[in-house]
Amino acid sequence: QKPGEAVILEQSIDNDGLGQYTFGFKTSDGLIRQEQGVVKNQGTENEALEVRGTITWLGADGKDYSINFVADENGFQPQYTQ
């Protein structure tokens, strides 16, 4: 590992093959990503994928920062937390 490069410490992936999935990972530089997707209104004209997730990272100040998000038919909707 070179200075400034991160490696994946943990990783999980699950996909049911029908549009629903979960995945996540954690890296050596403190980045954590969790995400899940589900098909809403499946089989209708209003069918849409809804994705929810969280991205957390360690700031240069040593504090954790996070973005929780939803992405669906209404677009990408992030919420920042500290």
Swiss-Prot record:
Keyword match Phosphoprotein: no
GO cellular component: chitin-based extracellular matrix
Listed InterPro entries: CHIT_BIND_RR_consensus, Cuticle_Struct_Prot, Insect_cuticle
GO molecular function, one term: structural constituent of chitin-based larval cuticle
Function noted in UniProt: Component of the abdominal endocuticle.
Pfam families: Chitin_bind_4
This protein's name: Endocuticle structural protein SgAbd-6
Modification Pyrrolidone carboxylic acid occurs at: Q1
Keyword line: Cuticle, Pyrrolidone carboxylic acid
Residues of the Chitin-binding type R&R domain: 18-82
Domain of life: Eukaryota
